[in-house]
Amino acid sequence: AKRYSEQYNYSMDIVYNTIEEMIKTKKPEAVTAFGNIYDHLKIVEVCAPAGIHVMVEKPLAVSLDHAKKMEKLVDKHGIHLLTNFETTWYPTNQKAYELIQQDTIIGDLRKIVVRDGHKGPKKIGVNKEFLEWLTDPELNGGGAITDFGCYGANLLTWIMEGKKPNSVTAI
């Protein structure tokens, strides 16, 4: 927290040791959970009973079991739970969506190819803390397939308005 305080120039007065302490003190309407994926469930377990909405960074959960537990909490307590997939907001993807929705421009989609990747987290310079949980199977849940594969799955689910594909191939 101290490193982030210095890096982003904010006071340590707004840093709390636990989410419970922060919620009790600040009483937020919503929180964002942009840490390791395993902790998404804990954040929802703490926030949902207090009626606090939650936005997590992709993917939603490390497992179907965690996702189902979050779903039950959301339903029981009536909160919103949003998964942020940043690529959805890219202007290029917004334009692609717009063109696809206008039937007369592109026509029926028959095949979609998604390619994602980079040189690797170390080569692109991610910080030590992020690298530690990103490469931990328990904290991350699925490695590169959940870190990058989820973008294509999200974009295509959005573009196809939830219609399931006939087949999927991954290389």
Stretches with model-predicted labels:
Residues 58-59, 85-87, 116:
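Short strand-turn motif at the edge of the Rossmann-like AdoMet-binding core
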Residues 12, 51, 78, 107-109, ...:
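A general structural motif
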Residues 69-87, 108-110:
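Rossmann-fold dehydrogenase core element
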Residues 90-171:
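Predominantly a Rossmann-like dinucleotide-binding segment in NAD(P)-dependent oxidoreductases
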Residues 8-73:
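Beta-loop-alpha module in the N-terminal Rossmann-like domain of NAD(P)-dependent dehydrogenases
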Residues 3, 21, 30, 42, ...:
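Alpha-helical elements of Rossmann-like donor-binding domains used by nucleotide-donor carbohydrate transfer enzymes
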